[in-house]
Amino acid sequence: VKLPPAVWDWSGGYIGGHVGGGYGRTSFSNPYGPSIYGNVVDTPVFLAGGQIGYNWQKNGWVFGVELDASGAVSDGTNTCLAASGFVVSANCKAGPNIFASGTGRIGYAFGALGHTLAYLKGGVAWQNNRGDVVNNFEGGSPQEKAHFDYGRLGATIGLGVEQALTPAWSVKVEYDYLHFGGPSVATPPTVQNPPFAILPANTTGLSSNYHIGKIGLNYHFGADPWTAQWSDAPLYAKAPAGAPIAYTAGWSFEGGSRLWLSRGRFQWDHSAVDAGGLEDPSILISRLTYHGLDGLSGELFGRLDSPWGVFLKGNIGLGRFHKGNMNDEDWGLPPYVNTISGQTNGRFTYYTTDAGYDFLRGANYKLGGFIGWTYYEQSSDTTGCVQIANPMATCLSPGDDRVVGSQNTQWNALRVGLSAETMLTERWRLSTDVAYLPWTDFKGRDNHLLREETTFDEQRGNGGGGVQVEGVLSYFITKNFSLGIGGRYWAMWTKRRGDSLCSSSGCIGAPPIFAKYSMERWGTFLQASYRFD
């Protein structure tokens, strides 16, 4: 007599690894009073690390504890300590390089013989955060700088889904929120004018929070790691109404379209130091920040799978935006100027293309690594110009919305990442991608149209890094047709020693200036796709 297959038990120890990425913010308090602008540094982050844990299962409920640690790559800058247009404010830089956490988990096993675990988690977390507080250009006065590098305990909560692939291996997709209060760190003395005065060194309080998506792979102790499939186990606990949705062993192509509702950001840090100089390029004379760039794009995507586990995938999209703001900050004489302008005629295009290999795959899952390329281009016109910081520096009157400038940006980057797909139930599928961008190349052009002579800045940068994270939950209406909802976060940045070169007739012979560039775009999309087996 053939016995029915046993329900999977999650009890026992495990060890594994993970990659992840997402969005962070570090906030700086202002010891000089309420800030006109800034004080929050966006810190996109990519992380990779490992975890070890233990589960106890009682009926369908699963309880567990887990320790994890990650190394992180992150970068972000913004204005801080901008209490007045008569005080030289600072350029604040922040970025974590290590995360660790100890959490408890509670979840419920459902689906095919208990192979799918949905869980909540919470506990303590630790980060190491480091950065600088650098006075911007002080008009010839000695430049001051303060550095910080600290560890801090905080808290984390999260949720996730873990799928048992074989008796030895499981893959998880997880969202974590982390929050850290911060210490007080030193700020350098700065200059006020008028009346001229040296404001003494002070302190600023820091706090940080992060939204992180992860893909993890766990090995469960006591099982044969080379067992590729479950022994004689049906995919679903009851007979499905139709043919089950599962991955074919032969050639397969899935393609479709998406609508992506997203928000974008672009930042240009313009150093006060000539390219090639020995001074700190973090000392700024100007910064332009384009933010709130809300847009809608249409997109085509596809994935081709071979019988040998090799796959090709990619997407291409085109979008527009007609809202957003640009803050143009300058330091020198006067000490601080900040104008705000609108955005119109916004356009963005993008594509990604990857080749990879599924090193774990079965009838209802695939997990693989990939290498590829990504491209992103954005253009917009800037309208209006209203001064918000210093009454000694005026711009246009409120309501005068003439076009005063434009910006074009083009990004290319190498992608290296992990892709995971698993059928949670008969018709629900979860798909995720996490990619690290180890190298970026940036080219842009800025047009200033409000000056007596129109000026053009040719912008270049490379090195740096980036992160791209995506997740989709799909429902198969038929065996081949599905609808889905997903989320996506993209960020790229260059090294501080990129440059910008004024190329108009009014600045012939001017040297290249150090510059740093960064971008973000994130949002939610809806998709429809069809699979050909």
Language model segments and positions:
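A charged helix-plus-loop insertion that forms the helical arch/lid used to bind
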Residues: W331-V337
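Gram-negative outer-membrane beta-barrel domains
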Residues: V1-N325, I340-D533
